[in-house]
């Protein structure tokens, strides 16, 4: 049963229109933990979360966890946080995703390394008809990227794969950065969840606020100074 009152946003995003579609969130770190909580606050119930880490002291400043969660598996702590905030239950898996798992309609790919993302993509997402949308985020100190891909569309597959890089690059520029700033993660996570909102409204044609939209596949932002750039892979030659 949906225990959260969604009347304040239902004209922009209706959980009933989303229905029983399954969402898989792979990684419950700086962006993943926030994304899971935001999805639940939208009223979505079929949320599945994968992570194999425990909450450590350095996670408190940039993730949704509290001091009381230190030492607990992230997925267990996140389950309790979501329940306390929304009354909703999420499904959790305290395990590493290796590509053997069957994933659902929407996948948020948010693991710590680019190599693990590529492995999961190749084995469990790429050209899998069960998954209609993949959203991936990358974060630096004051900048980030959001990728929004239909993994069965060849132009989008090619466009996303051309953005990939090795872990040694990621360590200094994006998701592997040793510096992680909470407000950057907040901005990135909200931007990622908004792409799900946009996707559903485009898919259903039921955006009751009357806004016409076309999905972007790459969104780049910088916060110093505030700048945002977008690109659509379907328009690539």
Residue ranges and their predicted role:
Residues 26, 34, 70-73, 77, ...:
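Conserved active-site and cofactor/substrate-binding residues in soluble primary-metabolism enzymes
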Residues 73-104, 111-114:
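A structured beta-alpha segment of the ubiquitous adenosine-cofactor-binding alpha/beta core
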Residues 19-44, 48-54, 193:
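Glycine-rich adenosine-cofactor-binding loop
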Residues 26-29, 50, 94-95, 109-112, ...:
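Short His-Asn-centered micro-motif
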Residues 22, 102-106, 110-237:
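Glycine-rich phosphate/adenylate-binding loop
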Residues 1-23, 158:
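N-terminal charged helix/coil linker that caps or initiates catalytic domains
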Residues 46, 89-91, 133:
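Conserved beta-strand segments of alpha/beta enzyme cores
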């Amino acid at each position: 049963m949906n225990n959260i009152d969604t009347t304040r946003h239902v004209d922009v995003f209706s959980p009933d229109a989303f229905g029983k579609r399954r969402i898989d969130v792979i990684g419950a770190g700086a962006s993943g933990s926030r994304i899971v909580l935001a999805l639940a606050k939208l009223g979505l119930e079929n949320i599945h979360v994968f992570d194999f880490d425990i909450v450590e002291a350095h996670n408190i400043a940039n993730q949704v966890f509290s001091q009381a969660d230190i030492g607990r598996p992230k997925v267990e702590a996140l389950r309790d946080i979501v329940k306390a905030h929304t009354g909703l239950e999420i499904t959790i898996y305290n395990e590493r995703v290796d590509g053997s798992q069957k994933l659902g309609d929407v996948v948020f790919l948010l693991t710590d390394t680019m190599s693990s993302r590529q492995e999961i993509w190749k084995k469990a997402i790429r050209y899998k008809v069960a998954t209609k949308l993949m959203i991936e985020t990358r974060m630096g100190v004051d900048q980030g990227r959001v990728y929004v891909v239909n993994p069965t569309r060849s132009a989008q597959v090619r466009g996303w794969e051309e953005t990939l890089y090795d872990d040694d690059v990621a360590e200094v520029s994006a998701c592997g950065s040793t510096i992680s700033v909470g407000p950057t993660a907040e901005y990135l996570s909200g931007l990622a969840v908004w792409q799900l909102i946009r996707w559903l409204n485009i898919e259903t044609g039921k955006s009751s606020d009357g806004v016409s939209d076309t999905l972007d596949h790459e969104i780049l932002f910088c916060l110093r100074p505030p700048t945002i750039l977008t690109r659509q892979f379907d328009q690539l030659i």
